[in-house]
């Protein structure tokens, strides 16, 4: 979902199995975010190559590498060129997430979603409170200026290179 709730096709390199959305329901109890307005797992078996071994250890695969290095986001530059996304903005959301939003959450769709944003450079996977994500996004919207975008872009490069807070 893009700016003002307009649906768009977001391009990404596939890092998850084709049935990832169908398998989401069975994993909802493990959601670090606590509800279904946003979904994150410590170890996601829907990621290509990820397996839980018989002894309980986790084995990661190529999909995890693609996600940790943020390579899966690279095709979103096409969305920026098409005008659906911005380099910096709020996190893009799914339709089923939007349907569960309260009024104050909808501020996140007032601007174009971005490839990166305040949430991504402020802890990414370490943030497990949806209201904190909303707070960071609304703070970005309220304080937006060109300098803030440059700061976030530079911080994004640092975050990606150091793989800080990556999924």
Briefly describe each language-model feature range:
Residues 1-167:
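Conserved small/aromatic sequence motifs within transmembrane helices
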């Amino acid at each position: 979902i893009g700016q003002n709730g307009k649906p768009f096709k977001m391009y990404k390199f596939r890092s998850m199995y084709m049935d990832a959305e169908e398998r989401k329901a069975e994993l909802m109890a493990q959601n670090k975010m606590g509800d279904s307005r946003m979904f994150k797992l410590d170890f996601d078996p829907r990621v290509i190559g990820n397996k839980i071994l018989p002894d309980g250890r986790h084995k990661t695969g190529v999909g995890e590498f693609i996600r940790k290095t943020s390579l899966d986001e690279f095709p979103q530059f096409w969305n920026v060129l098409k005008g659906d996304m911005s380099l910096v903005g709020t996190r893009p959301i799914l339709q089923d997430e939007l349907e569960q939003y309260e009024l104050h959450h909808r501020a996140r769709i007032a601007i174009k979603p971005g490839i990166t944003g305040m949430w991504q450079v402020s802890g990414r996977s370490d943030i497990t409170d949806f209201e904190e994500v909303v707070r960071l996004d609304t703070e970005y919207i309220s304080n937006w200026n060109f300098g803030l975008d440059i700061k976030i872009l530079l911080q994004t490069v640092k975050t990606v290179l150091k793989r800080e807070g990556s999924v």
